[in-house]
């Protein structure tokens, strides 16, 4: 193979590689898998947690979820998930037992997670809803 053919092959490989990377990134953006920042909802006062990042991470391969609350780490099982229908059911939350300020916010998070039944991806956010709720229980922002 002469030098010109080698350079052309290299450029073509780079183009295909770049296209594949973009497709994987876009697919990940539409997936629950990965780490998110948690907000209770857009209508609720989140000011007590402005300086604290509460996270929720989904590991779809292991069917687990978990994260960092205000004071405690937590986790549980993903009992059911149907990404094409936008349905999900999370198991009971297991957490460490550290007490601190803003426990009401953290307890609200732990109470809502098992109520989640469906999700909707929209504009880089994931909205988690209860069975018949029109207002999201939780709003997740990709990290």
What are these regions (language model features)?
Residues 19-143:
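Lipid interaction determinants
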Residues 1-17:
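Sec-dependent bacterial lipoprotein signal peptides
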């Amino acid at each position: 193979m002469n030098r010109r053919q080698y350079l052309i092959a290299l450029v073509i490989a780079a183009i295909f590689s770049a296209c594949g990377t973009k497709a994987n990134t876009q697919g990940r953006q539409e997936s629950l898998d990965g780490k998110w920042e948690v907000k209770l909802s857009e209508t609720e006062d989140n000011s007590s947690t402005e300086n604290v990042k509460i996270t929720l991470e989904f590991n779809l391969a292991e069917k687990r979820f978990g994260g960092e609350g205000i004071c405690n780490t937590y986790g549980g099982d993903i009992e059911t998930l149907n990404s094409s229908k936008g349905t999900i059911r999370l198991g009971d939350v297991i957490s460490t037992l550290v007490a601190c300020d803003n426990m009401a916010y953290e307890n609200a998070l732990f109470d809502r997670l098992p109520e989640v039944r469906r999700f909707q991806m929209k504009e880089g956010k994931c909205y988690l809803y209860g069975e018949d709720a029109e207002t999201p229980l939780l709003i997740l922002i990709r990290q």
